Amino acid sequence: MKIIHLQKTERTNMFYITYYAKKHNKFITRKGQYDKPDGTKGKSFISKNGTPCLVYWDLDNEGWRMATGEAKVRT
């Protein structure tokens, strides 16, 4: 599944996202949500080189993360 813009109803709900992390050189799964709890918005976009990207709030580490490329999102 490619990263796509999340619907408004999905933006505040918790989800699990699995994607290949170059930093860790393996597939990782994180618990996150689209927006930060204080209301700061996450975003999804296509990079200049055509790679889909999703910036989301990591609920376990309480920080922003960016998933790039193919990702699987489940609620």
Give each language-model segment a name.
Residues 36-46, 73-75:
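Short, surface-exposed linear segments at secondary-structure transitions and domain or protein termini
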Residues 11-23, 28, 33-39:
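Short acidic, Pro/Gly- and aromatic-enriched capping/linker segments at domain boundaries
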Residues 8-16, 48-54:
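A short, compositionally biased
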Residues 49-75:
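Acidic, low-complexity intrinsically disordered segments
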Residues 19-20, 45, 56-57:
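Hydrophobic beta-strand positions
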Residues 1-7:
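Mixed-charge, Lys/Arg-rich low-complexity intrinsically disordered regions
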